A protein has these predicted regions:
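Glycine-rich, proline-tolerant flexible connector loops at the mouths of alpha/beta enzymes
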Residues: 52-77, 99-112, 163-189
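Non-globular sequence segments
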Residues: 100-159
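Active-site glycine- and acidic-residue-rich loops that bind
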Residues: 30-31, 144-148, 153-155, 187-200, ...
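An active-site-proximal structural segment forming one wall of the substrate-binding cleft
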Residues: 84-88, 139-164, 198-208
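N-terminal capping/small domains of soluble enzymes
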Residues: 1-102, 143, 151
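Short acidic/polar active-site loop segments enriched in Thr and Asp
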Residues: 49, 160, 215
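Short beta-strand segments
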Residues: 20, 98-100, 165, 218-223
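Alpha-helix-loop-beta-strand connector modules within alpha/beta enzyme cores
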Residues: 68-96, 178-215
């Protein structure tokens, strides 16, 4: 069964082998290098049916926390992603881009916007550790818009879909987890309220892309 073809929405997969996202830290300035492009092409040539890329930091000032992580906020990065996606497609692979906001993992002085602090639901990076910025409603709305716009760009580039990274203690998971979400507004309290941020991101993304564009959501109880 693992080698059988599979159809996901309108995306034809040659088999059911899926490569999970793995951070590479090989994209200086947010631009995937030729080595990164070659890395993904080799996996497609080796008959991986569906590749989920490493995390792509969304185009938001506070999204980054690690060096040399790819982005979508420049012509150079978009051109590199086009080359990368085309390299997978010509080798009969399918590709989903993982969209990522690192939230409270962002350290003071981290580029590309060193003056911007890490963002979290209520200032907590873990229970009892208050070292980050508690997001305002405006911050939340800007972040939702950034996810949706980058999903639109991914579809325009040629990705088959996107995966929203909602796991491992990063921003969305920080809202989901009651240990770090101590908000007293519409985004905190019950599990339904803590999930509101994630739900609004998914809805905003879905509204910006076509009905056959794959939209996935990654979640996990494991924390980074």
């Amino acid at each position: 069964m693992i080698f059988d073809k599979y159809t996901l929405k309108k995306t034809q997969l040659r088999n059911r082998i899926v490569m999970a996202p793995m951070t590479r830290n090989m994209s200086p300035g947010g631009v995937p290098t030729q080595d990164v492009i070659n890395y993904y092409e080799r996996r497609a040539r080796a008959n991986v049916g569906l590749i989920i890329t490493e995390g792509i930091e969304i185009s938001h000032d506070a999204s980054s926390a690690y060096p040399n992580v790819p982005r979508l906020d420049s012509d150079a990065s978009i051109d590199a992603w086009k080359t990368l996606v085309n390299g997978i497609k010509i080798n009969d692979g399918a590709v989903i881009g993982q969209l990522w906001h690192c939230g409270g993992f962002r350290k003071p002085g981290m580029g590309p916007n060193p003056e911007v602090p890490g963002h979290t639901a209520s200032g907590l990076t873990r229970p009892g550790k208050n070292v980050a910025h508690a997001m305002s409603i405006n911050d939340i709305n800007e972040t939702i818009d950034a996810y949706a716009e980058d999903a639109r760009i991914c579809e325009k580039i040629g990705f088959d879909g996107i995966e929203i990274h909602g796991a491992h203690g990063y921003l969305i998971d920080n809202f989901l987890w009651e240990g770090t979400n101590q908000r007293e507004d519409a985004y905190g309290g019950s599990i339904e309220k803590r999930a509101k941020f994630a739900s609004e991101i998914i809805k905003a993304v879905r509204a910006k892309v076509s009905k056959d564009f794959i939209v996935g959501f990654r979640f996990s109880q494991w924390k980074q």
